[in-house]
């Protein structure tokens, strides 16, 4: 099920990006003491006391020629639309400002849970200054310091109290859930309609007609599926409507609910940098992946065109070397019937479980074929391996020193596992662990 979403909202230069980086544990956002320095939305996963969530740094959205308060209003409205909980960030050094009050008015009308944070309270003497923030109407203000990491535990405790209860989606466990992700107008909704044989999803030539994820139950040859069609992911800076600002987040939430992710490309336009970024989301999710090249009917081709396009995909998406590629046309429905069997295959691979004795035979054969690497005179020793998870298949390899497992040798082991067991369309995770 989708993780809860926290949005950090506030006027520029209250420290949203610093707090975001503290929560996710790494420096993802650019942080400078200049209002509006965070130029785009930053998304990341966080965890607090066994609560997993997604978090958005909304700092400095579309900083440009628009009036200052309009920027704030757009930022808050977008966060309201997507978030389950909003952290309203203010600056204790500045006190309550007119801009804070503008944000508060919008959030107060939202009926979304709001946790009020007063940042830059860097020492105990400043705590008495936070009481003015009660006037914003959101109850107790939580004093925090992004610079020193103070008060974040209490803040996240309060935010977690407002996370929605996890509910099952009502579909059978055997139902295969697959999502379609890609740039606007690559034909995702047309592909859904081609599979269903009806105009289930509104389709037009306007990029981004599908505004949100739409679930569609679907049955074929006695098997049940749920198709999750997502709003297109736009290249940053091109679109300013608030309904588009979190299309990436919507797609990420759809991916979380999926067993299989279809990365849809436009065969007519070819591959652009945004496609690579979108494909990266699919790979990072650990879901099974199929690359779909749509609009193949519109491509001028000969007997070498498909092979050349496939080689281009492999060059751009080296991290998805395991993903099968399907060429089709949603418009003419040519080859669309080949897609479902591929989805079945990668979903099955995603769930493969290997017996420990069989797994170790393959690992030891691999070591005999290609001896383990050495570093500073020490050789990697692999004692045994075991599979600890599926979706994706995850293996723990017990070794003398995890630092000796070089990524190139890890890749070699993954390739041997693929050759032995298939694993079509699914990533493989290998975790090196020292033997006690």
Swiss-Prot record:
Q: Quick one: which residues bind GTP 2?
A: 182-189, 229-233, 294-297
Q: Which domain of life is it from?
A: Bacteria
Q: Which GO terms describe its biological process?
A: ribosome biogenesis
Q: What Pfam families does UniProt report for this protein, alphabetically?
A: KH_dom-like (PF14714), MMR_HSR1 (PF01926)
Keywords of the record, alphabetical order, are: GTP-binding, Nucleotide-binding, Repeat, Ribosome biogenesis
One MF term from GO for this chain? ribosome binding
Q: Which CDD domains match?
A: EngA1, EngA2
Domain KH-like intervals: 352-436
Q: How does it assemble?
A: Associates with the 50S ribosomal subunit.
List the HAMAP family. GTPase_Der
Similarity comment text for this entry: Belongs to the TRAFAC class TrmE-Era-EngA-EngB-Septin-like GTPase superfamily. EngA (Der) GTPase family.
Q: What is this protein called?
A: GTPase Der
- Organism of derivation: Bacillus cereus (strain ATCC 14579 / DSM 31 / CCUG 7414 / JCM 2152 / NBRC 15305 / NCIMB 9373 / NCTC 2599 / NRRL B-3711)
Q: What is the lineage of its organism?
A: Bacteria, Bacillati, Bacillota, Bacilli, Bacillales
Q: Which gene encodes it?
A: der
């Amino acid at each position: 099920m989708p993780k809860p979403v926290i949005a950090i909202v506030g006027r520029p230069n209250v420290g949203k990006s610093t707090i975001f980086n503290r929560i996710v544990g790494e420096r993802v956002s650019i942080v400078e003491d200049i209002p509006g320095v965070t130029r785009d939305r930053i998304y990341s996963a966080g965890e607090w006391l066994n609560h997993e969530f997604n978090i958005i740094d909304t700092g400095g959205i579309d900083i440009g020629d628009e009036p200052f308060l309009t920027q704030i209003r757009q930022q808050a409205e977008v966060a309201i639309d997507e978030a389950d909980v909003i952290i309203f960030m203010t600056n204790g050094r500045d006190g309550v400002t007119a801009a804070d009050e503008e944000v508060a008015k919008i959030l107060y009308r939202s009926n979304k849970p709001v946790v009020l944070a007063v940042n830059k309270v860097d020492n105990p003497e400043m705590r008495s200054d936070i009481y003015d923030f009660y006037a914003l109407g959101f109850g107790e203000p939580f004093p925090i310091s992004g610079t020193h990491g103070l008060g974040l535990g209490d803040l996240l405790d309060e935010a977690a109290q407002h996370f929605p209860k996890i509910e099952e989606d009502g579909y059978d466990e055997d139902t295969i859930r697959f999502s379609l992700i890609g740039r606007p107008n690559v034909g995702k909704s047309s592909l859904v309609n081609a599979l269903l044989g009806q105009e289930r999803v509104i389709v037009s030539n306007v990029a981004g007609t599908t505004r949100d994820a739409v679930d569609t139950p679907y049955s074929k040859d006695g098997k049940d599926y749920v198709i999750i069609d997502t709003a297109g992911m736009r290249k940053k800076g091109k679109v300013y409507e608030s309904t588009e600002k979190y299309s990436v987040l919507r797609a990420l939430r759809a991916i979380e609910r999926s067993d299989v992710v279809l990365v849809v490309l436009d065969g007519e336009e070819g591959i652009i940098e945004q496609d690579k970024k979108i494909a990266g989301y699919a790979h990072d999710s650990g879901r099974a992946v199929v690359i779909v090249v749509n609009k193949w009917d519109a491509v001028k081709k000969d007997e070498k065109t498909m092979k050349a396009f496939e080689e281009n995909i492999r060059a751009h998406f080296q991290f998805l070397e395991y993903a099968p590629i399907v060429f089709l046309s949603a418009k003419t429905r040519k080859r669309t019937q080949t897609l479902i069997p591929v989805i079945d295959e990668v979903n099955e691979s995603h769930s493969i479980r290997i017996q420990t004795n069989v797994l170790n035979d393959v690992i030891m054969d691999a070591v005999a074929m290609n001896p383990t690497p050495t570093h500073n005179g020490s050789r990697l020793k692999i004692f045994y391996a075991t599979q600890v998870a599926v979706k994706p298949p995850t293996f723990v390899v017990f070794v003398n020193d995890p630092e000796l497992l070089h990524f190139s040798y890890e890749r070699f082991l993954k390739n041997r596992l693929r050759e032995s067991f298939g694993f079509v369309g699914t990533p493989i995770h290998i975790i090196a662990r020292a033997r006690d």
